[in-house]
A protein has these predicted regions:
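Bacterial N-terminal signal peptides that target proteins for export
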Residues: 2-12
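Caspase-like cysteine protease fold
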Residues: 260-288
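C-terminal motif of bacterial Sec signal peptides marking the signal peptidase cleavage site
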Residues: 23-24
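Sec/Tat-exported extracytoplasmic proteins
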Residues: 102-106, 157, 161, 185-188, ...
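Functional beta-strand-loop-alpha-helix junction segments that form "active/interaction loops"
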Residues: 86-173
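Bacterial N-terminal signal peptides
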Residues: 13-20
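Boundary/activation segment at the start of structured domains
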Residues: 29-108
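Catalytic cores of nucleophile-dependent amide-cleaving enzymes
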Residues: 171-251
């Protein structure tokens, strides 16, 4: 038993070590200035458009690009920590960023890539290879607008923000019209507060995945207002990389249980972070 506990403790320490190195979520007293455009002043104001093909299922992923300058993080190498350069960014164009990882996936086909605006620097639209009614839309938010990205995620989870887009003559839902909404990036709620109301407006429960450090602790108070269902989020420092979401979605699309989806996420984390499965399960949790 002593030997088993020693192995487990070593795995947990290793997990936390790698999480610290790669998550870069801890603010070491860093003074930051985060730009925030409120819903009343931004062009990206709240919409409530609901007319879309109800046979489609959208997964909308909002990514706050890693940003050494505008986020309260332990700095990463300059090349991958430029929040205004999605092509090289840790959470987008790097090897385990959303764009690179999903473009290489055998499960998803990239239909379109487009530049959006000064806040959402790029949008990707994927379609699932076998379950063709499933679409994944990923938006890369300029890192200095992490507050907008966080707010848009919560507005979407609550049903306050809804939109649509047309791809190959099919109109699919976005934001609150999505079946699942995901946030990926630094946990900005460790650095700032949001005073907006994210109260659910349509009595619908949306699924969500939040890949950010301590996301259960910091997102819980606001997420409860939205009535969303947290399928996967974190209990500690973590590296919010694309393979976690990718493998979790494989279970989600197959209509697996929340525990099975969480298990897929943990197994992926264990594999890529070289930590024990048990340690990964302690990090990536499901439900309240």
């Amino acid at each position: 038993m002593h030997k088993i506990m020693k192995i487990y403790n070593s795995s947990l320490i290793l997990l936390l070590f790698f999480s610290f190195i790669f998550s870069n979520c801890e603010n070491k007293g860093k003074n930051i200035t985060t730009t925030f455009l409120s819903k009343n002043t931004t062009k990206n104001k709240l919409k409530n458009v609901e007319n879309f093909d109800k046979n489609t299922q959208t997964i909308h992923v909002l990514v706050a690009l890693c940003d050494n300058k505008y986020q309260g993080i332990v700095p990463v190498p300059e090349k991958i920590g430029n929040g205004q350069d999605p092509d090289q960014n840790l959470y987008w164009g790097a090897a385990y960023g959303i764009r690179t990882y999903f473009k290489k996936s055998k499960d998803w086909k990239l239909l379109k890539s487009e530049k959006k605006d000064s806040i959402r620097m790029e949008r990707l639209i994927f379609q699932h290879i076998s379950k063709k009614n499933y679409y994944l839309v990923a938006d890369a938010y300029d890192g200095q607008y992490i507050k907008n990205c966080t707010a848009d995620f919560l507005y979407s989870s609550s049903g306050q923000m809804k939109d649509v887009l047309t791809i190959n003559n099919t109109r699919i839902g976005l934001y609150g019209n999505s079946r699942l909404v995901s946030y990926i990036g630094h946990d900005g709620l460790m650095d700032f507060q949001l005073s907006e109301s994210f109260k659910n407006t349509d009595n619908q429960t949306r699924d969500c995945i939040i890949l950010a450090c301590y996301s259960k602790k910091f997102f819980s108070p606001l997420l409860k207002e939205t009535k969303a269902n947290p399928l996967v989020w974190s209990s500690h420092l973590m590296a919010p990389e694309a393979y976690i979401l990718h493998d979790a979605l494989a279970g989600y699309i197959n209509k697996e249980s929340a525990e099975q989806i969480r298990s897929r996420a943990a197994l992926a984390y264990s594999k890529y972070q070289k930590c024990s499965e048990k340690a990964a399960r302690n990090l990536l949790v499901t439900g309240w």
